[in-house]
Amino acid sequence: MSGWQNTEAKISISKREGRSLSTDRIADPRTGQFSNVQEISGRGPVWRLSQAWFQKGFEDQGLTVKVGRMNMGEDFNSAPCESQNLTLCGAQVGKTVSELWYNWPITVWAANLKYDLNPTSSLSVGVYESNPENTKKSKGFNLSTDGSKGVLIPIEFVWKPKFNGLNGLYRFGAFYSTADAIDVLNDENGQAQLSVEQREVHSGKYNTWFVAQQQLTQHQDNPKRGLSVLLNFNINDKATSEILGSQQIALQYKGMFDARPNDSMSLGVARTEVNKRLKKKKKLENELNQVTDVQDPAYVPIQYDETNVELNYTYNWSPSIMFRPNIPYVHQAGGRKELNDAWVIGLTTRLNF
């Protein structure tokens, strides 16, 4: 900003449109897919205020303060998005506890503080409004705090080492939510209950994560070219979370061909892990209703783990135009063993002006 050093302000408005292939062709409509083969799909085809924040850095103190409307994955659990599949793109915590952790394009009132411990490490903490009203299609520009259930408090340590001249970035983080959370299965006495009203209400919820980005090789003439690996793991509170967590690994080779030094090829695998307590609850419900036929409308689908794989090639035609042909593969969409595996041919395009 003019006249202000180390200061930045940003406002972004987004609009998503189109149909979801995962919903229309891949997943069981009773469960949906944990991921989505189109990462840009989700949260409704509506206009939204996706960023409206002010950030100020205090270089002498090593502090950066940020306040305004933002999403959690912008500054915590952040990871690159080098795939079209959702579970191989960006902050993964939002995919396993989407009722609390909001990624783009959702925003909430928030503030966070980053303190640089030394040139290679920092510690960040934030306070984010926990308000499900912001996810509604009719609340794309909601600025009210009406409907807030509490706050979500993330903390993260970031380390940026170099091993033999190869850049790395490691994130160790966790969050605690003060919003009430209903037990997946049991009441206060530890007895299984199918009725939501009879289950125990916990006074909070937590998650922990680890993200690693490490370059493994590089070219002598261009250190940006070479093989890199991305790891992304997160674990949820098993008492209150239907999804226990997710694991992701991806390999990317940038500049594989001398004639295309800015292009890259990636292969990623992601697993979404279902809480065993959720499976137990659904099996119990089917037993009580004496339903065994999966086609019966009264049958409650049992959900297991879901696996997503994607191979893609990123073609950077120019600094402002990118094409990414890709082949995603989905195993047990929505954790449904009865479904056939799905192969998809996709194309991501990106235009920057």
Please state what every model-predicted region is:
Residues 9-11, 65-67, 113, 123-125, ...:
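Membrane-embedded beta-strand positions of outer-membrane beta-barrel proteins
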Residues 1-2, 55-59, 114-116, 158-164, ...:
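Structural signature of outer-membrane beta-barrel channels/translocons
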Residues 141, 154-158, 173-206, 217-218, ...:
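Outer membrane beta-barrel transmembrane domains
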Residues 94-219, 224-237, 253:
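Signature for the C-terminal beta-barrel architecture of outer-membrane proteins
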Residues 51-53, 110, 154-156, 209-211, ...:
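Membrane-embedded beta-strand positions in outer-membrane beta-barrel channels/transporters
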